[in-house]
């Protein structure tokens, strides 16, 4: 593997890691659970409403999502 490809791979991996990283204090915690389960999503817009972007193939249960919009890799789930 050439050094240029290796450098490109490292840069892409670093960008992805920085994009999905979230400071523990930024994520809201579940109030009824002391094990500190955190929501993992990014803000997005869907049909004129704000939602949460999820990288998974479907909106997770238990958050009260009623609709969603498809994006390139995931979904924007809206309450």
From Swiss-Prot:
Proregion span(s): 22-38
S-S bonds: 44-76, 46-69, 59-77
Taxonomic superkingdom: Eukaryota
Organism encoding this protein: Bunodosoma granuliferum (Red warty sea anemone)
Gene Ontology MF terms in the entry: ion channel inhibitor activity; potassium channel regulator activity; toxin activity
The name this protein goes by in its record: U-actitoxin-Bgr3d
General function of this protein: Potently and selectively inhibits voltage-gated potassium channels Kv11/KCNH/ERG. Acts as a gating-modifier toxin that shifts the voltage-dependence of ERG activation in the positive direction and suppresses its current amplitudes elicited by strong depolarizing pulses that maximally activate the channels.
UniProt subcellular location: Secreted; Nematocyst
Assigned protein family: Belongs to the sea anemone type 3 (BDS) potassium channel toxin family.
Entry keywords, A to Z: Cleavage on pair of basic residues, Disulfide bond, Ion channel impairing toxin, Nematocyst, Neurotoxin, Potassium channel impairing toxin, Secreted, Signal, Toxin, Voltage-gated potassium channel impairing toxin
Main location as per UniProt: secreted
Leader peptide range in chain numbering: 1-21
């Amino acid at each position: 593997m050439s050094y240029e490809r290796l450098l490109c791979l490292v840069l892409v991996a670093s960008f992805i890691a920085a994009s999905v990283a979230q400071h523990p204090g930024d994520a809201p915690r579940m109030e009824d659970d002391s094990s500190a389960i955190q929501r993992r999503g990014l803000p997005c817009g869907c049909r004129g409403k704000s939602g949460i972007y999820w990288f998974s193939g479907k909106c997770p249960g238990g958050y009260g999502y009623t609709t969603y919009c498809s994006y390139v890799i995931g979904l924007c789930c809206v309450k």
